[in-house]
Amino acid sequence: YKSSAELAPLIAEAVGMETKDVQKKLDTKLPSGKDAGAATLIRRIEKQQADNLKKLIEEKKLSGIIVSPDTKRYYPNGSFLSHVLGSTNSDGKGLTGVELQYDSALSGVPGRKITELESQSGGFPYTISQFTNPVDGKDVTLTIDENIQFFAESVASQALIDHKAKAVSVLVMDPKTGEILAMVNKPDFDPNNPYDGIENFVGETDGEKLQKMWRNRLVNDTFEPGSIFKVITAITAMEEGLVSENDTFTCNGSLTYGNRRIKCWKSGGHGTQTFGEIIQNSCNVGFMQLGEKIGSETLVEYIKKFGFGQISGVDLPGEAKGIIKKAANMSITDLVTIAFGQTNTVNSVQYMAAFNT
């Protein structure tokens, strides 16, 4: 074949690439503008692609094309646990998840041999070569329970369909040890092909779509916890001796602070309730009154004690700390809304760890 234009379509068909991409590789130039002596066309191809290319080389008697063995991380369960495990690039470097967090431990150290050579006969006689033995990468053992993870993945996938949701996340934690037993985000991706599937995600650029696909929302995203935070407020009041089971709270449907009227979820109000009943009814007004009793300094103190506003130490990359308003900057409106779960933000792992404390 006289030109890359003639050869490119044949190679492209064999390995499943675009002809223009193959030709660009064949026409690779050095910085000086001269033709490059060699270029890597594609890495980590499947066996069938390699066989196709070898057959083409043999049939067309092509020279200068080398199909060489390479290493590739293989994930036998596909997308299972993908946001936790993460994935690697073509050089085996971690991109996301545990692969990124523990890249240096998993990679090991390659061996080396240093020796003197000459062009005709190879090594010089009587010279001493220096050897450095390779060091295997270490194993990383996860707390994930495979059976619980499988069930959680199935539930999340079904919820995505049943509720026509944009995304579903599931987190399961052992309340006694804090160990994470399952962590699921749907939709997910296949770490064997970590760049495939970005068309299912929204973004202005492919890079933005890719980051959304890889994003472990349970660790990387924060949210206003809402009513689930009322447990933290209730425990704070109990620990400080500011409330008893016989204390009563009156809810008429809203309370006004300054110019802002803040409503309970039940527009007609819950009437007079005990401490236990404001928890049972998830009454916003009752928890606003409880927040006033606690005060900003004490509430922030307990928020920090429960681990909010700081990383949980989950050992996954990019954990978001969340935003916790300082007591000195807190208005009365901030105080009462924080008491029932608004204003501050947390991540899912933080909340689960706090709830299980």
Predicted regions and their residues:
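Acidic/histidine-enriched alpha-helical segments
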Residues: 21-32, 72, 165-177, 250-252, ...
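Carboxylate/His-rich catalytic cores and anion/metal-binding grooves
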Residues: 92-121, 167-192, 299
